[in-house]
Design a protein with these regions (language model features):
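Acidic, proline/glycine-enriched N-terminal capping motif
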Residues: 1-126
Length: 126
């Protein structure tokens, strides 16, 4: 079974906490500014890592076991899962976040001195 492991430095952010509603031809809900800043910071790093390692975007079912080391005890697991999945798609690690079919082994933890996400993407037969 193939597993890809990596660490994303910096405080992970959820996508929907403090979401913004805009009126642009109708109502739209935008992701939180904190998530956008985090995504814009880590996506280029992840893209460069994928290029260095000649990784093609994942286009088959995987389990994402992610340890979210947060700077504070806030946010819910589902919000962190969604935020990470969208970052992995934006960076080209996964072709589409639909390929993340499970989050077995994921946990929310706190490490204010060194926030990060440690993750392992493992191929699955689901």
């Amino acid at each position: 079974m193939i597993t890809i492991t990596l660490t994303i430095p910096g405080a992970p952010r959820t996508k929907k906490n403090s979401g913004r509603i805009v009126h642009a031809g109708g109502l739209r809900l935008l992701p939180s500014k904190a998530w956008e800043q985090w995504a814009n910071q880590v996506s280029p790093m992840l893209r460069a890592w994928a290029l260095r390692n000649r990784l093609q975007p994942i286009a088959s079912p995987v389990n994402c076991a992610a340890l979210f080391y947060r700077d504070a005890d806030r946010g819910d697991a589902v919000g962190f899962y969604q935020g990470l999945a969208d970052v992995l798609e934006k960076a080209g690690i996964v072709e589409n976040d639909k390929w993340i079919v499970s989050w077995d082994g994921s946990r929310l933890r706190k490490d204010a001195s060194r926030p990060r996400v440690e993750l392992a993407l493992t191929a699955t037969k689901e």
